[in-house]
UniProtKB/Swiss-Prot annotation:
It comes from the Eukaryota. Belongs to the intron maturase 2 family. MatK subfamily. It is found in: Plastid, Chloroplast. This is Maturase K. PANTHER family: MATURASE K. One of its GO terms (biological process) is mRNA processing. One of its GO terms (molecular function) is RNA binding. The keyword Plastid applies. Usually encoded in the trnK tRNA gene intron. Probably assists in splicing its own and other chloroplast group II introns. GO terms for cellular component: chloroplast. It holds the Pfam family MatK_N. Its main location: plastid.
Length: 509
């Protein structure tokens, strides 16, 4: 009991983060403008000098505390349009500025922790691919996974309350609460639709910060459980999940864990050294080498704990228990599973020989071909059946520019899916992009694909649509036999920080 109370002890820091005065500093909004502002928004407001003025911010805060300040009169349509445009502009200014301000104490803590532990290359951990080497080393030993869909908080007030444990500045939190309740449509943030508000489209920074704080809140329990159950005590996760606990939660945790005679004897159901937790965006995975009964206990425990102590409504049907040998796990654009790779070893002792069948577990990462084709169809590169089609392009685009844009998409896909175990599935994607590019150029020149390729030459397309593996073979032709092993193996890169959304490319043509 004493160990739990020490772990959950409220940190009595003498330093207070007073962020409210920063809201009225113009240089803060200049930084926010450089980092996240879109100048297209500013151009929609005539008479604005592309500068986040202190007077505008003060005027915004004053209007926020006034009642009915955006009542629209049906008799003045011009004024209505002006108020709507300025409301979106004020929306943009205060959200970007507040997101920049509230990140300051967290950035300072993280920088000080990283400098203290001399982690020079911590930026490599931002890469999406950095998680897959961990999966390769550990998932082959696991049997079951809990596939968890993380729910959103049921009310904006929960996000403000969570942030209150980090930032002890009542004025800033009160302004944030008023801002969210007054302007934000939380449903449009969770499920953005066509024609949604400007905030849901362009102000993702503040929402992502609040959502990550919300997720970090309930993930803090894993640090405690890991320190209690694992032989290797956690030394790095505490930096990322460091938080300030309050006394009411301490009492509730004591009721959960310590209302027993012998705490260590009743922690057996979570005492699993090989339990691993992974999260990305709205999905998390809990993997273990335990049995199905063990995973069911974890499922019941997590659902009950999160619902009662973190105000999260986890529907039990949103948590799936899958066996890795029978199910593929959709995670970060890959289909991952653990399959048995049979191998036959011949052993000979004197005149007798034996054939020994060994089944070795192997972690596979495959390219989800059907979702990729669906993304290509959504971006108008092909139809729903995967047949390439031509894309409408502007007449002022040159042939080399069109080829370069198609080639960039192809290279990005090859770069991201370089960790696939079977790269032959990427050939169909490359074929769709290559033929779609040829049909687009033929449509521009009002010719057929065959006549266009015969006149221009297919080598030109192959030059622009060359994958990274092809570049290796052409650069080092004498080492082709050695590079063939590299081509067949998985390659993980440490410069990938987002998943390519093919739907975003359709606006570039």
């Amino acid at each position: 009991m004493e160990e739990i109370q020490r772990y959950l002890q409220l940190e009595r820091s003498q330093q207070h983060d007073f962020l409210y005065p920063l809201i009225f500093q113009e240089y803060i909004y200049a930084f926010a403008h450089d980092r996240g502002f879109s100048r297209s928004i500013l151009s929609e407001n005539p008479g604005y000098d592309n500068k986040s003025s202190l007077l505008i911010v003060k005027r915004l805060i004053t209007r926020m505390y006034q009642q009915n300040h955006f009542l629209i009169s049906p008799n003045d349509s011009n004024q209505n349009r002006f108020l709507a445009r300025n409301k979106n502009l004020y929306f943009q200014i205060i959200s970007e500025g507040f997101a920049f301000i509230v990140e300051i104490p967290f950035s300072l803590r993280l920088i000080s922790c990283l400098e203290g532990k001399k982690r020079v290359k911590s930026q490599n951990l931002r890469s999406i691919h950095s998680i897959f080497p961990f999966l390769e080393d550990n998932f082959s030993h696991f049997n079951f996974v809990l596939d968890i869909g993380i729910p959103h908080p049921i009310h904006v007030e929960i996000l403000v309350q969570i942030l209150r444990y980090w930032v002890k500045d009542a004025s800033s939190l009160h302004l944030l609460r008023f801002f969210l309740n007054e302007y934000c449509n939380w449903n449009s943030l969770i499920t953005p639709k066509k024609g949604s508000s400007s905030f849901s489209k362009r102000n993702q920074r503040l929402f992502l910060f609040l959502y990550n704080s919300h997720v970090c809140e309930y993930e803090s329990i894993f640090v405690f459980l890991r320190n209690q159950s694992s032989h290797l005590r956690s030394t790095s996760s505490g930096v990322l999940l460091e938080r300030i606990y309050f006394y009411e939660k301490i009492e509730r945790l004591v009721n959960v864990f310590v209302k027993v005679k012998d705490f260590q004897a009743n922690l057996w159901f979570v005492k699993e050294p090989c339990m691993h937790y992974i999260r990305y965006q709205r999905k998390s995975i809990l993997a273990s080498k335990g049995t199905s009964l063990f995973m069911n206990k974890w499922k019941c425990y997590l659902v009950t704990f999160w619902q009662w102590h973190f105000x999260l409504w986890f529907h039990p049907r949103r948590i799936y228990i899958n066996q890795l040998s029978n199910h593929s796990l959709e995670f970060l654009g890959y289909l991952s599973n653990v399959r048995m790779n049979p191998s036959v070893v011949r052993s000979q002792v004197l005149e007798n020989s034996f054939l020994i069948n060994n089944a070795i577990k192997k972690f596979d990462t495959l390219v989800p071909i059907i979702p990729l084709i669906a993304s290509l169809a959504k971006a108008k590169f092909c139809n729903v059946l995967g047949h390439p089609i031509s894309k409408p392009v502007r007449a002022d685009l040159s042939d080399s520019n069109i080829i370069d844009r198609f080639g960039r998409i192809c290279r990005n896909l090859s770069h991201y899916h370089s960790g696939s175990s079977k790269k032959k599935s990427l050939y169909r994607i490359k074929y769709i992009l290559r033929l779609s590019c040829a049909r687009t150029l033929a449509r521009k020149h009002k010719s057929t694909v065959r006549a266009f390729l015969k006149r221009l030459g297919s080598e030109l397309l192959e030059e622009f649509l060359m994958s990274e593996e092809d570049v290796l073979f052409l650069t080092f032709p004498k080492a082709s036999s050695a590079l063939w092993g590299v081509y067949r193996s998985r390659i993980w890169y440490l410069d990938i920080i987002c998943i390519n959304d093919l739907a975003n490319h359709k606006s570039k043509f």
